Amino acid sequence: MLATVFVRVFHSFRFVEGVFFMKQPAHSPRVSPTVRLTETAVMIALGTVLSLVKLIDLPYGGSVTVAHMVPVLLIAYRYGNRWGLFSGLTYGALQLLLGMKNLSYATSMWAGLAIVCLDYLAAYLFLAAGAWFKKALPQPAAVSLGAVCACVLRYLCHVISGATVWAGLAVPTAEALGFSVVYNATYMLPETIVTVVAAFYLGSVLDFSKEHLSPRRHTDKKAGFGWRVAAGLVAAATVFADVRLVFSRLQDADAGTFSAAGFAAVPWGLVGAVTLVGAVTIGILWRISYTVRINKDKNNNL
């Protein structure tokens, strides 16, 4: 249902594609406009759902999601920078609809406009960074570096907004820039870690450059591929769990900044246990993958 709504929205703005996206980049998959619009709508819908799933809900404000920006980053990688800009802008507009209550804090029309532009439209416009390194780097590295750039640029948008629009509301104007830098880092740092890990994992196991989405595997390493995929999934889940255990304690509930006392509240024993279990599981899965591949090679040589 949600995907259908987004398809209708995209079709209603087909004139945008006609004006800005007449020529599809040479390195993009050759698919019909309908397929491209449908894929984009589905990925934006997925990102919207993931944005509602909170890995961490911080006490002073801000949250960390389950990599909600990754679907749009992957669409940008798949179809190029210009399409990524369009998709990011659309996604930002949807995030604005979900965060309309923030406009109630605006002290003027111009402040409200700045919130819309900085915290939503510009912040997610840069999801187009998913396409920036497609020609220069292998897919996992290209998507991961694009994710880093998108997160950093989104962070800068929030910092500028906090130092201007929100100055004098939450903190004194003279301290607004310093506060904005630190406060926005309390949720954007873990969000960046989660986003980059998810982007690297998906970029490693799926090929987004082909017309039809398919597993990304070398011909000589097909045997045991499923075990390696499982190992990567365990690695990503381990990082997600550690991020939640650590960063959920680091924001000061009264000041909104990083709290040194929060480090003492982190259950480091549990963090270590989760990391150890994850590492052992990954090792076992990789060993199984290696054994399967070796046995396959032996059978081929018989």
Where are the language model's segments positioned?
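Alpha-helical transmembrane segments and their cytosolic interface
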Residues: 10, 15, 21-42, 175-302
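Hydrophobic alpha-helical transmembrane segments
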Residues: 37-41, 70, 85-89, 113-117, ...
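Aromatic-anchored segments of alpha-helical transmembrane domains
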Residues: 44-53, 92-101, 151-159, 237-245
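Interfacial aromatic-anchored transmembrane helix boundaries in multi-pass membrane proteins
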Residues: 50-64, 90-131, 168-170
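Helix-capping/transition residues at the boundaries of transmembrane alpha-helices
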Residues: 76-77, 130, 134
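Membrane-helix interface motif
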Residues: 100-101, 160-170, 242-256
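Mid-bilayer segments of alpha-helical transmembrane spans in multi-pass integral membrane proteins
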Residues: 120, 124, 128, 151-164
